[in-house]
Amino acid sequence: MTLWLPASGKIYLPPTPPVARVQSTDEYVERTDIYYHATSDRLLTVGHPYFDVRSPDGSKIDVPKVSGNQFRAFRVTFPDPNKFALADMTIYDPDKYRLVWACAGLEIGRGQPLGVGSTGHPLFNKLRDAENSSERQEGTVDDRRNISFDPKQVQMFIIGCTPCLGEYWDTAPVCKDAGSQLGLCPPLELKNSVIEDGDMFDIGFGNINNKTLSFNRSDVSLDLVNEVCKYPDFLTMSNDVYGDACFFCARREQCYARHYFVRGGVVGDAIPDGAVQQDHKYYLPADQQNTLENSLYFPTVSGSLVTSDSQLFNRPFWLKRAQGHNNGILWNNQMFVTVADNTRNTNFSISVTNDSSLEKYDATKIREFTRHVEEYQLSFILQLCRIPLKAEVLTQINAMNSDILENWQLGFVPTPDNAVHDTYRYLASKATKCPDAVPDTQKEDPFGKYSFWNVDMTEKLSLDLDQYPLGRKFLFQIGVQRVRSGTKRPATRKVTKTVKRKKVQL
């Protein structure tokens, strides 16, 4: 017998208020056929690969830390296109449009030869080799060793008009009723922060805050021990509603476990058989081996072969469609280029002597130094675009970032309150109120608190694309042939004379 029964599931209805739809920049940005080329100077940096070298009193940094395992975060500033003197005045009408830049292509140039760098720690927390163990070894008070290894191989760059967002693991706040946490593993939480110039990226030990999670200062290499190791938060940036942080990215990571070691110290989480008597689920005890050795295993990774066949740099990239709603529009005339590359990770060894009369080798009179150098050059192809000053377009831009309209001098004027304000004349006088109480009228840089490698392109733009390597590649890519300059010589005409024959009358 068939019976009709009421539906047991819930009925989901759409939300009553309308969902705000974010438009893609392709829906309101009008692109022109005017392209500019911009290239930076050769960007060089030199420093110590493991730490900052400070002055004897520690008051200043004599040699900065420059490691091949650091992020390079470039903040590129372009000129305001609304202040350009364009030859075609029909393109720009300040009463109807505002001009913006769009990134059409770029090339991140890298100098210096390929090389594998070595990092390590003179007091690395390594009890013994866990792969080729010949005999049992009991831990002592200090089992640290001088260990060196090559890092995981990383090539990566992220392009956007806002800084790249990174993620790392750090200690989380402890609950109030948790009691004393001395000697216990702290809770962990995933945190986000902007990737700044000089931040360390992951080389095989994970993206964690080593300042708070490495008490012994010997679990990682010397260049990571006092740093926060970050990794780009691709999930958050790809789900950004406006898509400003990451137009597109390219990455290549490779590694393999080269050595297998055991940590020294007391095991925090003991194997359950020996701790809570779980009926020998993990091992069977013996009379001769009634105590277990350390079980904190870890590998040291290697980046393996470095070759020019797998390089992401020194080659052009063209932006046709970005992954988010922002299809390459450079709001506020700036671009952020975040680069990670340790395939040119050679550390120089420099030796000097403190005895000018030394003629034979004496290690006690020779001082060894190490330095790391990096070389970059950034090139861009910019497309000139215009935005119509329509109400619906300005409303979305104002909701996205009101600073854009202020820079365009289109800020919304508030309703006057008809109040009389006080203006003091002598602010530095002791008879008036403290000048610090006067509000600062200077506009604050939203990214001023972060550290970037600033690259000024305000005087680096050119319309002659065929005069630059990236420009010639772009012209070839879009199928534009170069016009040969110069005056052509007229071809010589060959004049032939015809001879008339006289008629002879017979």
Swiss-Prot record:
The keyword Disulfide bond applies. It holds the Pfam family Late_protein_L1. Keywords: Capsid protein, Disulfide bond, Host nucleus, Host-virus interaction, Late protein, T=7 icosahedral capsid protein, Viral attachment to host cell, Viral penetration into host cytoplasm, Virion, Virus endocytosis by host, Virus entry into host cell. InterPro entries: Capsid_L1_Papillomavir, Capsid_L1_sf_Papillomavir, dsDNA_vir_gr_I_capsid. Forms an icosahedral capsid with a T=7 symmetry and a 50 nm diameter. The capsid is composed of 72 pentamers linked to each other by disulfide bonds and associated with L2 proteins. Binds to heparan sulfate proteoglycans on cell surface of basal layer keratinocytes to provide initial virion attachment. This binding mediates a conformational change in the virus capsid that facilitates efficient infection. The virion enters the host cell via endocytosis. During virus trafficking, L1 protein dissociates from the viral DNA and the genomic DNA is released to the host nucleus. Belongs to the papillomaviridae L1 protein family. This is Major capsid protein L1. It comes from Human papillomavirus 23.
